[in-house]
């Protein structure tokens, strides 16, 4: 736990003060932030929805703008990864495949926007079956108001580290598994995963490791190792099939 990292080296007096004065709570961040690299002091960010904070707190934040107490943070974090981050990653990988550098460019492309809409639709259907959440609650969490000035969001930032973003429980593979478990369509999610496996940005170390694995072991072994699906799983077979089709297109 995060709290353990804080308190492990405290003496008795400091620990007593800490336990009475400090609370550590989970949050859900709903905003886009970009920078040239992880050391950059020039950070571009936009916020259109409040920071969701796990209760209880020791202070009243009712009058503080952009902060909002919210129950069921753990469940909502899982949902947010699937429903917000899933289509976002799909946008990056499809955008890369089509030669875009900015996510916004893909979403202005009629076909691209339609594809992401279908990915979102599949994930949303799975979530409504998997979790005790209403359509209204889902909209409140995931439908972002339009910002006054759109911040260009790079394909590089959103697609970075495909080894993590294509892993078993993460945004796309986790969504596909969820839909499959409830006997719901997942065709567009599977295609998005295949686009992700084609992501070969040269400056992305994880992307290069992924491409080396595919080249050396083949796509079937690579999907098994990266996405975590068994060799008998229909998801593995469908992802590999789409990968070959898209690669040869």
Write out the residue ranges for each language-model feature:
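Substrate/ligand-engaging "lid" and interaction regions
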Residues: 1-249
């Amino acid at each position: 736990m995060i709290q353990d990292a804080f308190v492990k080296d405290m003496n008795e007096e400091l620990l007593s003060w800490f336990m009475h004065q400090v609370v550590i709570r989970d949050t859900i961040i709903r905003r886009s932030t970009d920078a040239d690299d992880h050391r950059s002091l020039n950070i571009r960010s936009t916020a259109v929805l409040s920071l969701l904070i796990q209760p209880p707190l020791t202070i009243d934040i009712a009058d503080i703008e952009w902060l909002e107490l919210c129950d069921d943070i753990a469940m909502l974090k899982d949902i947010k990864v699937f429903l917000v981050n899933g289509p976002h990653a799909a946008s990056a990988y499809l955008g890369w495949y089509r030669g875009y550098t900015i996510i916004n460019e893909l979403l202005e492309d009629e076909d691209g926007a339609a594809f992401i809409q279908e990915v979102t639709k599949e994930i949303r259907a799975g979530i409504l079956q998997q979790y005790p959440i209403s359509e209204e609650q889902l909209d409140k969490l995931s439908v972002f108001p339009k910002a006054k000035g759109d911040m260009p969001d790079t394909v590089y930032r959103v697609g970075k580290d495909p080894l993590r973003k294509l892993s078993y429980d993460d945004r796309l593979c986790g969504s596909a598994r969820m839909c499959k478990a409830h006997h719901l369509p997942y065709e567009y999610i599977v295609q998005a995963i295949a686009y992700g496996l084609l992501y070969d940005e040269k400056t992305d170390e994880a992307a290069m490791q992924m491409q080396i694995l595919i080249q050396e072991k083949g796509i079937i072994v690579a999907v098994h190792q990266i996405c975590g699906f068994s060799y008998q799983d229909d998801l593995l077979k469908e992802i590999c099939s789409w990968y070959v089709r898209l690669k040869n297109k």
